[in-house]
From Swiss-Prot:
GO terms for molecular function: 3'-5' exonuclease activity; DNA binding; DNA-directed DNA polymerase activity; metal ion binding. The lineage of its organism: Bacteria, Pseudomonadati, Pseudomonadota, Alphaproteobacteria, Rickettsiales. It is an enzyme of class 2 (transferase). Keywords: DNA replication, DNA-directed DNA polymerase, Exonuclease, Hydrolase, Magnesium, Manganese, Metal-binding, Nuclease, Nucleotidyltransferase, Transferase. This is DNA polymerase III subunit epsilon. The keyword Transcription regulation does not apply. PANTHER family: DNA POLYMERASE III SUBUNIT EPSILON. GO terms for cellular component: cytosol.
Length: 229
């Protein structure tokens, strides 16, 4: 059986529109194979080379001072593109993240880099609107609907929000009964994660009915991200 690799992705930014000079300050992406989290992820804070507006700071709590010594986007771009490769992207409100990522990629002025296609993204916001018309569709509301524990989400954060979205996405596409066998390895959330984790996707297999131990491993995976991201 061929493997289905999907990347659950989120970003944090300095504002709402890259055309007004706003930039990405955090990228969080989590690998899922056959609807199973592998424990492999990509996470960076990024120096936006500009100030942090207070309105944005109130949302994610990332200060300009904190970002001063963080890498510039161009230094992590190749690793990011390698991590997502040709996989389907799972994003909540995909047009927002795609436009910011493409803006950052366009600033590199490298002819060999192709911009991301919105058609290659699955938008969980669109899915939720279709499935639950008239309801609230933000991540907190969906976590509440599906009883996903988001108690550690006082502020937005790209990696922790991607972890929550992974749970929501599985619920939107069939529920926990069809997924979430966790790979038995520690979660790597540092900047070397893409090189340190074994990428043998055959380790991930679909589980029709997860055991208590498997569900506990998933909870521990999510908790570790909420505590450290």
């Amino acid at each position: 059986m061929s493997s289905l690799r999907e990347i659950i992705l989120d970003t944090e930014t300095t504002g709402l529109d890259p055309r007004q000079g706003h930039r990405i300050v955090e990228i969080g992406a989590i690998e899922m194979v056959n609807k199973v989290l592998t424990g492999r992820n990509f996470h960076f804070y990024i120096n936006p080379e500009r100030d942090m507006p207070f309105d944005a700071y109130r949302i994610h709590g990332i200060s300009g001072e904190f970002l001063k010594d963080k890498p510039l986007f161009h230094t992590i771009a190749d690793d990011f593109l390698e991590f997502i490769s040709d996989s389907k992207l799972i994003i909540h409100n995909a047009p927002f993240d795609i436009k910011f990522l493409n803006h950052e990629l366009s600033l590199l002025k490298r002819a060999e880099i192709k911009l991301l296609e919105l058609s290659n993204a699955i938008d969980t916001l669109v899915m939720a609107r279709s499935m639950f018309p008239g309801s609230k569709y933000n991540l907190d509301a969906l976590c509440k609907r599906f009883k996903v524990d988001n108690s550690g989400r006082q502020l937005h954060g790209a990696l922790k929000d991607a972890a929550l979205l992974a749970e929501v996405y599985v619920e939107l596409t069939g529920g926990r009964q069809s997924a979430f066998k966790m790979v038995d390895k520690s979660v790597e959330t540092n900047n070397l994660a893409t090189n340190q984790v074994n990428n043998k996707t055959e380790q991930a297999t679909i589980v029709i009915k997860p055991t208590k131990e498997e569900l506990q491993k998933h909870k521990e995976f999510l908790s570790s991200i909420l505590k450290t991201a």
